Design a protein with these regions (language model features):
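Catalytic-site neighborhood detector that most strongly recognizes the C-terminal catalytic loop/helix
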Residues: 87-89, 181-217
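C-terminal catalytic core of tyrosine-transesterase DNA break-rejoin enzymes
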Residues: 48-51, 55, 62, 137, ...
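Short, leucine-enriched amphipathic alpha-helices that occur as contiguous helical runs
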Residues: 27, 43-47, 131, 135, ...
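Conserved tyrosine-mediated DNA breakage-rejoining catalytic core shared by Y-recombinases
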Residues: 4-10, 65-105
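Active-site/catalytic core of tyrosine-dependent DNA strand-transfer enzymes
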Residues: 98-149
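Exposed loop/turn and edge beta-strand positions of beta-sandwich/beta-sheet ligand-binding modules
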Residues: 46, 77, 91, 148, ...
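Short, charged phosphate-coordinating catalytic segments
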Residues: 1-2, 53-77, 174-176
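Basic, Lys/Arg- and aromatic-enriched nucleic-acid-binding interface segment
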Residues: 2-60
Length: 221
């Protein structure tokens, strides 16, 4: 299939002039690179931030604001984040996080943290936000790998997973995808009559796709 791994851009997205969506080959290049794995020891904050950006679609500031008490486990054993700091009302949500990430080392990373301070080291700087340092390092990461196709930034990871969940034949239905991504539901009928998914229901829908992404990048311990 010639279109496999390509971004499924709508006309609206193409004409918006916004950030581009990573293609699958670029994602594999980023997350299989030697530089990426070096960061697990050298800069674990960056390592886990971009990995979480890939599988949760969270915005930078949503991730950098997460505290230890926002990392939860449901009654059914599903792991998730409670997002309390987002730019929209729909962005305040509970997000499934694949258990594989915790097994991969993220749990040990969290266990070292104390109190209610953010689990990541990034702090707000006047006018720049806490994600500025992440964005700059991610730009250097792309430059190192010679990934220079237009406007590819950290937010492009969010666009990638949203696009991945939209696959025509095997994607996630509109309502749970909007809830996961923190998007407003545009259809008045759907928004009025849809009941919000519980975190366990949402995890059951989303986790298989997150696990598939982890498989595509061949995450190694």
């Amino acid at each position: 299939n010639p279109a496999e791994g390509k971004s499924l851009l709508t006309k609206k997205q193409k004409s918006s002039g916004g950030y581009l969506i990573f293609e699958l080959d670029e994602i594999k290049n980023i997350f299989k690179s030697e530089y990426f794995y070096e960061q697990k020891e050298q800069d674990p904050d960056y390592f886990y931030i971009i990995l979480l950006g890939l599988v949760t679609g969270c915005r930078i500031n949503e991730l950098t604001s997460i505290t230890k008490d926002q990392v939860k486990t449901s009654e059914n054993g599903n792991r998730f984040f409670v997002i309390r700091d987002s730019k929209t009302a729909a962005g305040l949500r509970e997000i499934p996080v694949p258990n594989k990430l915790f097994e991969f080392g993220f749990q040990k990373f969290i266990d070292k943290k104390t109190g209610n301070d953010p689990i990541f080291k990034y702090v707000n700087r006047a006018g720049k936000g806490s994600g500025n340092a992440v964005g700059k390092k991610f730009a250097r990461h792309l430059e190192l790998l010679k990934i220079n196709r237009g406007k590819l930034v950290f937010h492009s990871l969010r666009k990638f997973i949203n696009n991945f969940l939209m696959k025509k034949d095997s994607g996630v239905p509109y309502e749970p995808r909007c809830q996961f991504m923190g998007h407003e539901i545009e259809s008045v009928n759907v928004a009025t009559y849809t009941v919000e998914y519980s975190i366990d229901e949402l995890s059951e829908i989303i986790n298989p796709f997150q696990d598939k992404i982890i498989g595509l990048i061949d995450l190694k311990s």
